[in-house]
């Protein structure tokens, strides 16, 4: 069984036991969270697509860690002016483990 969930403006395909890094959530480490925005649920040959979400379907997960991704470097040039601007960005994330997928 697997599901497609929406969180942080992105979509993720998840199965029980998966560990993934998603956009930062305001939850403490060890807390259990529920994702109610389930877009699709697949159980063997039975496929349930939501319009836009599957009714009464939830995915439960446990928050394992919070952190920051690797730095993304941004460089802006102005041609022929000997001008260069360097910047960097590190996005915050929450690492979660999928514990249950249910309807």
UniProtKB/Swiss-Prot annotation:
Q: What does this protein do?
A: This protein binds to 23S rRNA in the presence of protein L20.
- Which species? Legionella pneumophila subsp. pneumophila (strain Philadelphia 1 / ATCC 33152 / DSM 7513)
Subunit structure comment from the entry: Part of the 50S ribosomal subunit. Contacts protein L20.
| InterPro entries per UniProt | bL21-like (IPR028909), bL21-like_sf (IPR036164), Ribosomal_bL21 (IPR001787), Ribosomal_bL21_CS (IPR018258)
The molecule here is called Large ribosomal subunit protein bL21
Q: Name one GO cellular component term.
A: ribosome
Query: What does the similarity note say?
Result: Belongs to the bacterial ribosomal protein bL21 family.
Which NCBIfam families does this chain map to?
Answer: L21
Q: Name one GO molecular function term.
A: rRNA binding
Keywords (alphabetical) are:
Ribonucleoprotein, Ribosomal protein, RNA-binding, rRNA-binding
Gene Ontology biological process terms from the UniProt entry? translation
Family matches, as PANTHER family = 50S RIBOSOMAL PROTEIN L21 (PTHR21349), LARGE RIBOSOMAL SUBUNIT PROTEIN BL21M (PTHR21349:SF0)
Q: A Pfam family matched by this chain, by name?
A: Ribosomal_L21p
Highest taxon in the source lineage:
Bacteria
């Amino acid at each position: 069984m697997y599901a497609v969930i929406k969180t942080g403006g992105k979509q993720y395909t998840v199965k029980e036991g998966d560990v993934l890094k998603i956009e930062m959530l305001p939850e403490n480490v060890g807390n259990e969270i529920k994702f109610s925005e389930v877009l699709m649920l697949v159980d063997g040959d039975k496929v349930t697509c939501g319009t836009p979400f599957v009714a009464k379907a939830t995915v439960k997960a446990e928050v394992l860690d919070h952190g920051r991704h690797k730095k993304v470097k941004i460089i802006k040039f102005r041609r022929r002016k000997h001008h260069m601007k360097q910047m960097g960005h590190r996005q915050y994330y929450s690492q979660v483990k999928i514990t249950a997928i249910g309807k």
